[in-house]
Structures are given as C-alpha cells and as structure tokens.
Amino acid sequence: MPILLFLIDTSASMNQRTDLGTSYLDIAKGAVELFLKLRARDPASRGDRYMLVTYDEPPYCIKAGWKENHATFMNELKNLQASGLTTLGQALRSSFDLLNLNRLISGIDNYGQGRNPFFLEPSILITITDGNKLTSTASVQEELHLPLNSPLPGSELTKEPFRWDQRLFALVLRLPGVASTEPEQLGSVPSDESAITQMCEVTGGRSYCVRTQRMLNQCLESLVQKVQSGVVINFEKTGPDPLPVGEDTLMELCRPSNLFAAQPWHSCHKLIYVRPNSKTGVPVGHWPIPESFWPEQNLPSLPPRTSHPVVRFSCVDCEPMVIDKLPFDKYELEPSPLTQYILERKSPHTCWQVFVTSSSKYNELGYPFGYLKASTTLTCVNLFVMPYNYPVLLPLLDDLFKVHKLKPNLKWRQAFDSYLKTLPPYYLITKLESDQILASVGKKPPQEIGIKVKNHSACGLPLAHNKSFRKLLKEIIGESAPRLTELNPKEFAGFQVGLLNKDLKPQTYRNAYDIPRRGLLDQLTRMRSNLLQTRKFIVGQDEDSLHSVPVAQMGNYQEYLKMLASPLRELDPDQPKRLHTFGNPFKQDKKGMMIDEADEFVVGPQNKVKRPGEPNSPMSSKRRRSMSLLLRRAQTAPTVTNHVGGKGPLSASWFPSCPSLVKHTFGHPDTTVIHDTHEEKMENGQSPPDGFLLKSAPAEFMNVSGESFISSQLDSLSDDFTGLRKDGFIHKPGNNILLGGAKTCSLSVADQKITMASALETVPNSMQITPAMAQGINADIKHQLMKEVRKFGRKYERIFILLEEVQGPLETKKQFVEFTIKEAARFKRRVLIQYLEKVLEKIDSHHLLNNVNHINSRSSC
C-alpha cells in the first residue's frame, strides 16, 4: 500500500502571483488535485494512503496523517494559507518522523537480522515549494539542515532520518509573473539548483524546475510513473574492470585506457523493483541482504546502519548457480548506467557476484549472497538474492539430494559444519525453514503427537452398573458422589418444550407512552443503539444519508472504494478480455479502424445475435454512409425469363459445380461435406475459388487454378450426358453420386422438364424437397450466414458452403449473395466483399448464358 505524502510550502513567499493571476499556493493545490486524478487511473491506487504536511511548526504542520481519511485530506488542502516561514529542514524531519511512526512496532526494518527487501512500506514524498531562501525565526540559512534529534524510539539505529523505501521528489515553482515572449522549450524537465536537489538525490528521487504550466503537467505525469514498489540500493564496483566481450577483444586490450577515470556505472544509486505477488498482492521473499557487521552476543548495542545498503559487485564473469527446490529472490534493477553497461555486453549467460563489506567474520569483503545477471532477452538486469555464500552451499545441497539421498555421511556433515561457521547467525532461522521445506518434499507431514489424557468418565459403563455403584457409594459414605450427575435422556420421558406465548405482541412502541415503566431503561438503550447505527448485521438497503451527500463530498471515492471487496482474479489470465460494448453490440476497438480487416482486432466472442428492429431490407442501408465503397453493387446483366428456374421444379444447381450441389441438395446417404478444402490457401492470403465448390466435387469439373468451368468449356462435357435417358439420372457404378443439374441447360425445354420430373420420381418421397421445406432451409442458412460473417478471422469456406446449400431458383441464390455482401459491409470485411462480388458476376454471366442457350435451342427446333 503506497504512502503519498505531500509537503506543501506555506511560507509567505507562496503568495506571489504568476502571469495568469494565480498564486503559487493555488498552483500547488491544483497540482495535488491533478496528481490524484492521474493516479486514480491505475487500479492499484485503491490502496493508496494520502498525507498532508506543511511548513508550520510541529505538531501543527501535520494536517492529514495516519488517522485522517481522504475527505479530511481534501478539506485541509483547500484551507491552506501561506503565512509562515520557509522551514524546509524541520518540515522534512516532521514528514520522515510521521512515516517512521510505526516502523519499529511493525518490524519492517528488522534491525540486526538482515535487510529484507520484501518487508517494505513504499513512500513517496512530494514537496511543492518556490525554491527561495530557507528562513527561520533566527536568520536566513544558505544550506539545508535536518534536525538530528527525533522523539521516535529506535531512530538511533539508522544514521539518516529516511529509510530505503522512502524517496523525495521536489516540484520547484519558477513560474514568471509576466508572460514570456520566448518560445517554450520542449523536452525533459531539468533539475533545480536549489538546496533541496541534493536531498532528493540522496533519497533516490529528483527535483523538477517548473517554469510553465505545461512543464508542471509533464512533471505530474512523470511522478505518477514513479509510484513503484521498491527499495534504493547503492551499487559500487570492486576489483578490476571486466574484459570486453566480442570479436574486438584484442583491439580493446591494445587500446590505452585511463585506469584512474571513474566511469558512471562504477557507482549507481538506484531502485530495485519489488513486485507484489499476483495472488496475495503482498511481496514474497526468502533471503535477506546481509548486514554490514557481524552480530555477536557481547555487543552492548546494535551499530547504526545506513539507510541504503552498499552492495559491491565484482566484474569477474561467473556461471549462475541454481538448483531445484531451493528458493531464490529475483529483483529487477531500475534503468541506470550500470544496467546499460551490462546489457551492452550481451552476455545473458554469465553473472557478476555481489557482496556486502564486513558481513563475514573472517573475510573483509564478505562472501557472495547473490549475483547480477542480464535477462535472456537482454531487456533488463536482475538482482538474484541467494543464501549467504551460495557457491559453497549449493553443491552441498546438490550432493545431499542426488548422491546421499537425504542421508549424509560424516564427510558431508563436516563440510556443512564448516559452512555454518561462515554464516551470519540471523540466516539460521531462514535457512532452517528452507531446509525443512526441502526435506518435506515427497513425504507425508508428521502427525502431531498430543498429550493423551485417560478418560475417567463412567459413560462407557452400563446404566445398571452405574446406578448400583452410586447406591453402594451412598450407603458407605452417606452421601452421593462429589461430581456432576450424568443425565440419561431416557429418564425424562415427560419432558416438554415450552410453547410460544401467542398473546405476546411485537414491541414496536411507536408511542413512547406505551412503554411500561419497568422497560424504560432497556428500551432507551435500544433506541440509542438504533439512533447511533452501531449495528453490525447486513443492511438490506442503502441508508438515506448515502443519497443526500453534499456536492462538496460527491467526489470522495476513496472511502467508498475502501469498503468494497477486492475484485477476484481472472479464471483464465491468458484469455483476452472481452470488449465493453455498452449500448452497441457491434462496437469495436478504435485501433481496428485503421486497417482493412477491422474484425481481426476485435476482442471477445463475436457470435452475437442481430439486434431486433433492424430489418434486412434495402431500406435499412439508408442509415449507412452512401459514399462508402463497400456498398457498391455489382453490375447486373439484363435478365430474361428463365423457364427452367421459374415456376417449374426447384433447380438443383445454379453454378457449373452442379454435381456436388445436386448431391448435397437431395441428401444422398453417401454425401459428405468437408470444410477444410481451401483452409491453407485462405490463411496464406490467396483468393478462394471463385465458384462455390465443395471438396466432394469431382476433379474433372475443376481446372488447375481451382475455378469452375465457364460456358466455353461446357461442350467438352457432352460425353457425360450420352447415357442420360428420359426415365431418370445416370447412376455410375461404384459411385453413388447423382449427375445432371446445370448440364441439362444445353438440352431442350421438353427434355429438361422430363429430366427433372424423372429425377423427382427416382428419388423417394421422403427425400423430395417441398417449397415449404426449401423456405425453412433458406431461413436457417440466412441465420447461419449472419453468424459466419461476424466471426473472427479470414476463413470463409463455411460461407461459400452455406451459399451452395441455398434452395430455389438462380434469382434466390443471387439475393442471398447480395444479402451476404450487405452483412459483410456492416463489419467492413473488404476481402470477403471482393470474393462475393466475383461470385455475383459469375452468377449473372451464367444466368445470361443459360438464357442464350435456351433461345438457341428453341430456334433450332
């Protein structure tokens, strides 16, 4: 739970005006409110705690501390007045004391037992000042001095007043009082040159020199990004520089270098990110960073330690060591010259060991407790915290598990005892817990052995023996046994439960004079508890006070959010989140509108039912943009009355791929439909077959490119119709596929009628499709087409298969294609529209060809 403490300068110099007429104090108040709004965008801001401190004398400088809520914070912020001195040192000391008030009790600092990065209370101090001279009641100060005396117990254990999880950022207002005519400089905001800058850098923060309102907004956005969970560590190099890595190693060695020049990456003062656990929301760790002294029992007191530990790294390349089942901690380093140098070496399989000086009893530098290593993708540098002196411990544990099988010999025990002598005492608790976990892997937990108490009760004795024993005891000593009598439920046969008194009425007491005298005190207590609303049970409805909140308190969402339960985690984190489509089921992400296929970027299921009240008639397209190129219709050829597909029987085909269509239309038992015909071609971006061909269509009806035969190639198929008779279709041996359909277009009208009639006679009555059945099939196909068009991706095979199954004349099939084009235009399926327009053109050309052949056949007769 981050703590955000705002330290506002309330000195008299904050009353100066800017070129906009507002005072510095007004700008500071507005900056705090804007920061809260920017921070509220992050869902993690629900656990933020806000504090407000001014430059007044303590303890009056604390306006909102640990006990005040968000409403008090906002009220105190609005009521601030600038009328004091610029006592920055005292205000900073009061702010740090306020943050450290509960640290000794909570045990976060863990003095003398190592520094645990996962025990932290991340705090951000944001001070807003004008950067003028520091003043006090005595004189004007040139430098910033923090008082060393602190009333908090345990403050003497740390040399500095701040801790390693507390950072200071300063917004120094330098806004001019007269509008500047010079153009505003773009880029990053520079640091200020006031005395507070050094204090910010010591804590791991920085200062901002604000000269315009735009720079102030830029600084606030940067500060929102700085709210991270982590601790600040000093990284310093020890030993020689590393050898260069790469092909130019020899050239680098021959090149002269200044050995005494300090590089920026030799010493870095940066943050390491301590990420909270995704399940619990609290950071979890195992190993501490060692102390810079060896704790002993004869020490009179613990030596004070620095706020930021000094971690030294050796530039000798080592192999990263990790064994199974041994936990380790991993922390990411903030970008710095050190991380940049390690990443530029491009060696993710080597590491640099880290040490803490004087952490060991026998070695001044100490033993390694972890290492720095670049990530495998070379995007960041991580600090791995391992057990102390892990190069010795890990091989021992590896032998214990793999060689000795958890049964160590004498040699292993001696080596382990010598390792324990180099281990600081505070590591033993952590290591024993870890070893206990490792030893319990694959074993059942031991049963807890409790104290067995003998039961002296005579409940197990028979009832007759128990009665005779008590009777004998009474005769001997003259009294009953000095213990509780054991009740037998069978002895109370006439026991009855008291019934509810029906004459007793509920005591509502609407009139105070109806309360009897003996119940006045009891009723007064109940009335008081009801008035003060001190009940703890669940209220079925909201209180009336929630609906009559003043306007000034309507924006106080913090207190309401604290009462809400934390949201549950996602059941499947890998599943993409569903797009919020309130009021519009077809709402899409804005980034999807910048490409041709907008449906590729839609998140969530797309199988949604069409909204009621939106008909499919051509009149519904008037609400769309008339200038859209997606709605242009294909040029239709002049139509001539088709006597075959008109009022006659249902045409079995409407495209040259008639065999598969006839087979599917009449529902032959041997028919199979396979939808994966052109799936690979569709995924590669190539065009699908122009005709509606199923995989079950014979190969002789398709050319090399996958397109259907056109009218010029129909003559070559005349041999297939030599066996056509007037009594029915041809049945080829070994293949139960009905042939015919569109190929009959070259015959006479009479032959066509006879052929269709005989075909219907050949097929059983249960398999004939009536007009009512065809209408129902088409309605179902229309509904499926609407669902297929809305689906994600570019797999259009199912759409073409559904269009193949449309029942009715050629004009009906043409209407279905036009309807599919309209649906595709609603979802901006440009590629699908192009395919459908090609199909529509082929339908028109085929329709025209049928009519020409029909006229030629009549003229020949």
Curated annotation (Swiss-Prot):
Keywords, ordered alphabetically: Phosphoprotein
Gene: Ints6l
InterPro entries per record: INT_SG_DDX_CT_C (IPR029307), Integrator_subunit6 (IPR051113), VWF_A (IPR002035), vWFA_dom_sf (IPR036465)
Xref: Pfam families: Beta-barrel_INTS6, INT_SG_DDX_CT_C, VWA_2
Highest taxon of source: Eukaryota
VWFA domain span: 3-227
SS bond partners: none
Name assigned to this protein: Integrator complex subunit 6-like
Modified residues (Phosphoserine): 617
Keyword rRNA-binding: no
Organism expressing this protein natively: Mus musculus
SUPFAM superfamilies: vWA-like
